[in-house]
Amino acid sequence: MSVRIEHDTFGEIEVPADKYWGAQTERSKRNFPVGKERMPIEVVYGFAQLKRAAALANFDLGKLSEAKKDAIVYACDQILSGELDEHFPLVVWQTGSGTQSNMNVNEVVSYVANMYLKDHQIDESIHPNDDVNESQSSNDTFPTAMHVALYQEVETKLEPALKLLRNTLKEKEDKFESIIKIGRTHLQDATPIKLGQEISGWRYMLDRCEIMLSESKKHILNLAIGGTAVGTGINAHPEFGDKVAHYISENTGYPFVSSENKFHALTAHDEVVQLHGTLKALAGDLMKIANDVRWLASGPRAGLAEISIPENEPGSSIMPGKVNPTQCEMLTMVAVQVMGNDTVVGFASSQGNFELNVYKPVIMHNTLQSIYLLADGMETFNNNCAVGIEPIEENIDNYLNQSLMLVTALNPHIGYEKAAQIAKKAHKEGLTLKESAIQTGYVTEEQFEAWIKPEDMVDPH
């Protein structure tokens, strides 16, 4: 392998000649051969947005020449294009401030920027610390990149998937509005409900999650940049944080602002905890929806079988013809993983000792993973399951007509105790509810027909 020699304050080190990173990245690769979890590329893109904006701000404030500013902006745009992904090899498991990833970006930006200067025959050079990292610390850059990445992924990936599934459920809700089925509470028969009403509960869960997500993501717009090492802003111009936030907003289209309290921004990540709490709430709702779907689709002959779902693949390696609710199982596993991630994020956020929380990479890793899993899970569940949900009306009608809980409609006419006697007699003697009611003498056939109307029970008002 061809190598070149790079150096840092620890001395010289060999770096692969075809890679754009420098000495500190190479040391990190050697010092932290831990796990397979690469630092998400979205974090790198968040850093690129930050370094780009910092170059513009530093130029405005007289800290960088125009040539250096242009070169850094060019390098950051190259990163954002996805052309340089291979030059960011570091794993999540590194220093808790994310210093190695900050330097990885600084080194790649300076390498590409110096090529830009050389190509344009400009007699200047760019240093990863003195120029790319001008007015910054890893302590304020990593949480800034983290917030930029999280906000963008919620906007561009999670929310569209949430809307997609929500809209499908709304279509099913409207389509099945006239189908009356038996309701169930405590896994026991209850009073009737429309299939459309049941699905409306699922849909409204996603409506509420969309609102909660919109509220919680607002706090992610606060950026730590400008706080530098401990929140005081040492070595940074007083206007630097606001200018960087302005330029990030200009390039992304999102209204980022510089946090009004940088001491908080460096040592606490409660804003991410709140965001992930919403992700956990969404995971809980998806768990409930997926469980309901697979129970209602259970069968085909010895289960509830009130709905059918698409048959996507063989379900068993030993039982021929068996088809399983695989999409529901996938979504419930996603939900469990997100709930586990929430525990990690909450505990890690609590570990801000004095002026700095040093669990930033694991907070970022788990939150991004939750966003990806939920987004991919909802889209896949929607496309391969939810869109194909159909009622099995013969079974729905059979359960409805057999249900003893229709007796609830008699309460206002004969009282709770007599209605309970009718239901118990029917269950014990294997009678229909109508037969039991007439045999007790509490109601006539005409009264039963007038009072027991499922269509009235689902819309009592």
From Swiss-Prot:
Gene Ontology molecular functions: fumarate hydratase activity
Keyword Cytoplasm: yes
Reaction(s) this enzyme catalyzes, per UniProt: (S)-malate = fumarate + H2O
GO cellular component, one term: cytoplasm
An annotated GO BP: fumarate metabolic process
UniProt pathway annotation: Carbohydrate metabolism; tricarboxylic acid cycle; (S)-malate from fumarate: step 1/1
Gene3D superfamilies, per database record: Fumarase/aspartase (C-terminal domain) (1.10.40.30), Fumarase/aspartase (Central domain) (1.20.200.10), Fumarase/aspartase (N-terminal domain) (1.10.275.10)
UniProt cross-references to SUPFAM superfamilies, sorted A to Z: L-aspartase-like
Keywords carried by this UniProt record: Cytoplasm, Lyase, Tricarboxylic acid cycle
Record-listed substrate binding positions: 97-99, 127-130, 137-139, 185, 317, 322-324
Enzyme Commission number(s) of this protein: 4.2.1.2
Protein location: Cytoplasm
Disulfide bridge map: none
EC supergroup of this enzyme: lyase
Residues with site note (Important for catalytic activity): 329
Active-site residues from the entry: 186 (proton donor/acceptor), 316
InterPro entries named among the record's database cross-references: Fum_hydII, Fumarase/histidase_N, Fumarase_C_C, Fumarate_lyase_CS, Fumarate_lyase_fam, Fumarate_lyase_N, L-Aspartase-like
Note: There are 2 substrate-binding sites: the catalytic A site, and the non-catalytic B site that may play a role in the transfer of substrate or product between the active site and the solvent. Alternatively, the B site may bind allosteric effectors.
Family: Belongs to the class-II fumarase/aspartase family. Fumarase subfamily.
Subunit structure: Homotetramer.
Chain's role: Involved in the TCA cycle. Catalyzes the stereospecific interconversion of fumarate to L-malate.
Name of the protein in its database record: Fumarate hydratase class II
Naturally occurring in which organism (per UniProt): Staphylococcus aureus (strain Mu50 / ATCC 700699)
Name of the gene encoding the protein in the UniProt record: fumC
